[in-house]
């Protein structure tokens, strides 16, 4: 077992110990440890099963208890690359990013509006996550030195939460599968605790004036939260929705970070209500559905710090893992009445099972004290490659046109001299509206589409021509009749794909023909292609 028998009894019992042992390896395995140019450890988690993002804030936030427990080097390993990106000139928004790219490429946010717009971002969610995690590291180390490396970003995000956090606008949170929700009470709790964490960081840095200011704001927000979210014997899902409820898992930081912003009666009232509404296999995420998130149940179970309450919420989760008929790695999203997996396989978020251990300062100190790496002096973020457009995509040229058909053409459709007089003409950006990251200018809603266009290639020399493609789903590309590239699955933004040797050899100065076939099976769909020259960063 992962812990000695005395610790198992102390921290939550045998069922909890078995849950922790089951989660431990999966959490670490669902990501990659690497060394930076200075030999310091970095960690990149993968958002398995959903969109495959790398270094996602609202994935490493729920997984963080396992990393925090085992010391500063682990906890900082996933924050350093994220914070370096947030501090770069690539990130221009007043809130924290969502992700670093699509695994395994950490080359910039792809979720929602990416680096371009605020569409479908998670501004309160991500900003709160980072302030809380910085607060947790400071709590562990007894100083705010690590937070000081990124102080301008943390100040900016605290200002954002001060303005937007108490009563969040209609936006997504980490539970984005449930859709947008305005006036989210649990998200508000995250923002309030995040502001408290920032106040504590200010105090550790000796800025007592700012610390007092933010503690005052956090306490006032908490007072209003208690009043405005109250729904009798529990607290609401949304401030404007009486008769609703939700798990308030974000409140754990009020006690772990010793902020003491909320009365203990809040947790007690919530817990009594939770025990009255949970099902055979666990406590639903909120009143809207009967599904739950395993990681959040394990956080919620800790709120009163009472062993009986903890075991009351953990036992149904243990029962689910024993009785579910789904034979897959530990899922974190399942139905609480049927024990059926809804989705999410082998994700790192199950590291959240270890939240219970962060309440015991002696145990946390014991395991964190085993950190022998003492990571420091991380290398600067690598300079990104420069990209020069050779033939534009729809993003650069909204008026560019392609010839296209949705009827299977003759077998030589990709040859340079193929007759496309019977094909249609449409503006670049083919797909269905609502597809993530897509700028649709010509609707395509069938299973397949074939595209062709001519382009002129200036005289070289060209050292590193690559395909720039946004595809949903599988695509194959030909240049002057030669196979140039294939791209499986889907992306939510443009990616650069190396050209095959045959495609490179077929390119010539002057007139060229590019031909594309894209196949769609389910969900959104989109295809757009261009060529770029990549110059390596220094």
What function would you assign to each model-found segment?
Residues 16-36, 55, 93-94, 122-128, ...:
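Aromatic-lined, polymer-binding surfaces characteristic
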Residues 1-55, 76, 83-88, 369-397, ...:
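Acidic/polar, glycine-enriched structural segments that form the non-catalytic walls/loops
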Residues 1, 52-167, 184-202:
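Aromatic-rich carbohydrate-recognition surfaces in CAZymes
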Residues 423, 447, 455-481, 514:
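Aromatic-lined ligand-binding clefts that engage carbohydrates, nucleic acids, or primary amines
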């Amino acid at each position: 077992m992962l812990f000695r028998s005395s610790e198992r009894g102390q921290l939550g019992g045998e069922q909890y110990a078995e849950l922790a042992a089951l989660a431990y390896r999966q959490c670490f395995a669902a990501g990659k440890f690497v060394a930076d140019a200075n030999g310091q450890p970095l960690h990149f988690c993968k958002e398995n099963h959903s969109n495959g993002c790398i270094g996602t804030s609202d994935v490493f936030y729920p997984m963080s208890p396992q990393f925090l427990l085992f010391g500063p080097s682990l906890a900082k390993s996933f924050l350093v690359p994220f914070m370096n990106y947030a501090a770069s000139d690539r990130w221009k928004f007043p809130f924290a990013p969502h992700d670093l790219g699509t695994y395994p490429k950490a080359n910039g946010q792809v979720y929602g509006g990416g680096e371009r717009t605020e569409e479908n971002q998670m501004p309160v969610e991500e900003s709160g996550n980072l302030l809380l995690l910085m607060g947790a590291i400071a709590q562990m180390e007894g100083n705010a030195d690590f937070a000081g490396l990124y102080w301008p970003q943390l100040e900016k995000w605290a200002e954002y939460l001060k303005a937007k956090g108490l009563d969040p606008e209609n936006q997504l949170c980490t539970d984005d599968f449930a859709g947008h929700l305005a006036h989210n009470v649990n998200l508000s709790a995250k923002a309030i605790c995040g502001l408290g964490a920032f106040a504590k960081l200010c105090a550790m840095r000796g800025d007592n004036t700012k610390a007092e200011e933010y503690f005052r704001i956090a306490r006032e927000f908490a007072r209003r939260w208690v009043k405005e979210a109250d729904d009798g014997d529990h607290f609401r899902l949304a401030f404007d929705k009486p008769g609703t409820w939700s798990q308030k898992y974000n409140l754990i930081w009020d006690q772990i970070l010793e902020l003491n912003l909320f009365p203990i009666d809040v947790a007690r009232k919530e817990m009594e209500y939770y025990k009255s509404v949970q099902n055979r296999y666990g406590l639903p995420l909120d009143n809207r559905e009967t599904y739950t998130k395993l990681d959040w149940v394990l956080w919620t179970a800790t709120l009163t710090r009472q062993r009986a309450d903890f075991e009351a919420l953990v036992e149904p989760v243990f029962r689910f893992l024993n009785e579910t008929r789904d034979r897959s790695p530990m899922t974190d999203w399942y139905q609480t009445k049927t024990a059926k997996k809804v989705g999410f396989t082998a994700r790192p978020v199950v590291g959240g099972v270890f939240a219970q251990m962060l309440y015991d300062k002696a145990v946390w100190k014991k395991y964190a004290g085993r950190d022998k790496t003492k990571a420091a002096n991380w290398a600067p973020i690598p300079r990104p490659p420069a990209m020069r457009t050779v033939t534009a995509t729809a993003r650069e040229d909204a008026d560019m046109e392609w010839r296209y058909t949705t009827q299977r053409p003759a077998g030589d459709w990709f040859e340079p001299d193929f007759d496309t007089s019977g094909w249609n003409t449409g503006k670049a950006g083919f797909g269905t509206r609502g597809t993530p990251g897509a700028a649709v200018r010509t609707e395509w809603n069938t299973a397949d589409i074939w595209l062709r266009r001519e382009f002129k290639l200036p005289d070289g020399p060209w050292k590193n021509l690559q395909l720039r493609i946004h595809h949903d789903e599988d695509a194959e590309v030909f240049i002057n009749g030669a196979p140039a590239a294939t791209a499986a699955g889907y992306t939510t933004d443009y990616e650069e794909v190396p050209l095959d040797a045959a495609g490179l050899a077929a390119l010539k100065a002057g007139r060229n023909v590019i031909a594309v076939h894209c196949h769609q099976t389910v969900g959104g769909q989109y295809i757009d292609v261009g060529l770029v020259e990549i110059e390596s960063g220094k």
